[in-house]
A protein has these predicted regions:
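Helix-coil boundary and N-terminal low-complexity module in membrane systems
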Residues: 1-151, 161-164, 178-180, 185-226, ...
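Membrane-interface helix termini and inter-helical loops of multi-pass transporters
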Residues: 155-159, 229
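Generic alpha-helical transmembrane segments
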Residues: 169-181
């Protein structure tokens, strides 16, 4: 039987996390295996979307080769690319709904993790899906539809440059930031969908630059589509999903908790204020 390691000294209050930055690194140090398991679950639910992206890359490469080989004109290639982008964005709606289900379960596990609460992995995963899957699906569908509008309008950029970029701007600077707060709210509070959106706008106004930073990190992931098709590209995507995505979600959960503490928790939800944090002045 494997002998368990024992600490050389008793655990003291000073070793507990005193702010949410310390909570993040404590979770990485002490519960890395749980975080990786969450990443593997996210990868499982993200596989349909990855499959769509691989198909997009292959078809796009075939269009490019046909254009270079003189088998189609530049006008035909542009038409095919526009159709490919539209069909891909429509397929992404279904794929994102599938991913939203898995994310709802994982988000609850990571919430328990940053709160320092006991984790019953599969029980919490199923409970998160039961409680939040519908809300998460609704959020992803709205963002995906804005993306479809962006793809449609991108075909008008040459004729109407400003109009062509409006949906993309709405997605990056309005829909996605508010959606991030709607998702984190839904993991913690019981609140109506319209109220969650209203709250999301208010929270976004409290921390605009932090929120935009997290949004732009998602945009950078989206820009990987511009990279040429290669085994390295998809290997990095798979590894990023398993290791970096759950860390991103955990970091956003902690940022959200800071905002919630500042705006609502101190007065309305004192039991949630500084949850998972052991301030030195509270000793």
């Amino acid at each position: 039987m494997k002998k368990r390691k024992q600490a050389s000294s008793d655990f003291t209050f000073a070793q507990l996390p005193h702010n949410r930055k310390e909570v993040f690194f404590d979770c990485l140090k002490l519960r890395f295996g749980t975080i990786v398991c969450c990443g593997l679950l996210l990868l499982l639910f993200l596989l349909p979307l990855i499959t769509v992206e691989i198909t997009y890359d292959i078809v796009n490469l075939n269009i490019y080769n046909s254009l270079i080989g003189g088998q189609m004109s530049e006008t035909q290639a542009t038409l095919y690319k526009n159709e490919l982008q539209l069909y891909t964005s429509l397929a992404q709606i279904v794929c994102l709904c599938i991913f939203a289900v898995g994310l709802a379960g994982v988000a609850r596990i990571l919430r328990q993790l940053v709160w320092g609460e006991p984790i019953f992995f599969w029980v919490d995963f199923k409970r998160g899906i039961k409680q939040n899957a519908a809300r998460f699906i609704a959020v992803f569908v709205i963002c995906a539809l804005v993306n479809v509008a962006s793809v449609l309008c991108s075909t008008m950029i040459d004729e109407m440059p400003i109009v062509g970029y409006i949906p993309l701007g709405v997605l990056i600077f309005v829909a996605a930031p508010v959606a991030l707060f709607v998702l984190s709210q839904s993991t913690i509070y019981t609140v109506g969908f319209s109220k969650a959106i209203t709250n999301g706008l208010a929270f976004y106004g409290k921390r605009p630059w932090q929120t935009l930073l997290f949004t732009l990190l998602l945009v950078l992931v989206g820009l990987t589509r511009l990279a040429p098709i290669s085994a390295l590209k998809y290997t990095l995507l798979l590894l990023g999903t398993v290791f970096l995505l759950p860390m991103y979600i955990m970091a956003w959960m902690l940022v959200s908790c800071n905002v919630f503490d500042e705006v609502v928790n101190r007065e309305n939800y004192p039991e949630l204020y500084d949850k998972g944090v052991y301030r030195l002045d509270k000793q």
